[in-house]
Design a protein with these regions (language model features):
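Glycine-rich beta-strand-centered segment in the early N-terminal region that forms part
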Residues: 22-40, 52-94, 220
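NAD(P)H dinucleotide-binding glycine-rich loop of Rossmann-like/cofactor-binding domains
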Residues: 57, 91-158
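Mid-domain Rossmann-like dinucleotide-binding core that forms the NAD(H)/NADP(H) cofactor-binding site
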Residues: 130-204
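Short amphipathic alpha-helix with an adjacent loop that forms part of the alpha/beta core around
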Residues: 204-212
Length: 328
């Protein structure tokens, strides 16, 4: 038996209950991982609330969580790439999420396909990489699209959240000038400390502020400001849509396309093991150089999963939210 956070129906955070569940039999291509940290993501919030229904005929009981960092404690008979004691990170690929092909990461132990894991070297702080985690992989995809480097100025919306704060840190690690947009004035100083060269406060319900001209936009918000983000792009600029916390229905002037701008998007649903290992390798390389630091993280015990979901919903913190199974 192992402890896990279980959801038995859609609704408020209080429906997340800590229960004892059976350990599944390990398949030949799987490893059993003792979870050190499980990231809490907006995806988990939307699924629990019923906004993003689980894509199974009988979705409950359901264990949330789309990313984990932990240590291998058992290996299947066919696994040749990992050993007991190895530190690994895994995310998406049917773990939790709407696909729910296997139980999610909100538990003490999780069974994962070895091919879905990225091995972590001994010099990497496991809690730092857990904090960067899926947010860092997502932000990296955004910069791959819009471009990074000393000749780039990139605007990041939703900069105070999990992915946004990682995008600010990652952009600076890649040598990019960063404009951070947040709706919460209380987060401005923290964003500057993360490396933002300029912070724009755009409170909800108020007229959008004047945005500076940028070469790229990493958009995590969507909604009413989207058209203004497009206008902020210099000729030939690029916008990457990574999430729509303010809604995915947007409008913009089509004439902007005549200035050579391009728009695209990325979803972590496209991740596979090879892509994960490549992204994690790039992120940990920056960590070793000392150029990429983990953003702040609020940490909760498994039993406090409801409080962790409330923390994400309230959006009062900056950075990420983690569940730590070993915290009593």
């Amino acid at each position: 038996m192992r402890r896990a956070v279980v959801l038995n129906g859609y609704g408020p955070p209080e429906l997340l209950r800590l229960e004892k569940v059976r350990r599944p039999t390990l398949r030949a291509d799987e490893v059993r991982v003792r979870v050190l940290a499980a990231g809490v993501n907006r995806t988990d919030i939307e699924i629990r609330a019923g906004n993003w229904p689980i894509q199974k005929p009988q979705p409950f009981p359901y264990i949330p969580g789309v990313e984990v960092v932990g240590r291998v404690i058992e290996i299947g008979g066919g696994v040749k790439t990992l050993r007991q004691g190895d530190a690994v990170i895994s995310m998406m690929m049917g773990m939790g999420g709407v696909r729910a092909e296997r139980p999610g990461g909100y538990q003490e132990e999780v069974a994962l396909r070895a091919a879905d894991c990225a091995l972590l070297s001994v010099d990497i702080d496991l809690f730092d990489i857990a904090t960067i985690g899926l947010a860092g992989v997502t932000a990296l995809a955004g910069f791959d699209f819009v471009g990074a480097g000393p000749d780039r100025r990139v605007l990041v919306t939703g900069a105070g959240g999990g992915v946004g704060s990682c995008a600010v840190s990652l952009g600076k690690a890649l040598g990019t000038s960063i404009v951070a947009v947040t709706r919460d004035r209380r987060k401005a100083d923290a964003l500057a400390r993360l490396g933002a060269d300029e912070v724009v406060v755009a409170p909800p319900g108020e007229a959008p502020p004047q945005l500076p001209v940028v070469t790229g936009v990493v958009d995590l918000v969507g909604g009413a400001m989207f058209g203004q983000l497009v206008k902020a792009l210099s000729p030939g600029g690029k916008l990457c849509f990574l999430g729509g916390t303010a809604g995915d229905a947007v409008s913009f002037s089509a004439s902007s396309l005549m200035e050579g701008i391009s728009m695209g998007g990325w979803s972590s649903e496209v991740l596979d093991g090879a892509a994960l290992r490549s992204a994690v390798g790039r992120l940990t390389s920056l960590m070793r150089r000392g150029t990429l630091s983990a953003p702040p993280a609020a940490k909760f015990a498994l039993a406090d999963a409801p409080a962790a979901h409330h923390a994400v919903q309230r959006d009062e913190h900056i950075g990420r939210v983690l569940l730590l199974p070993d915290v009593p």
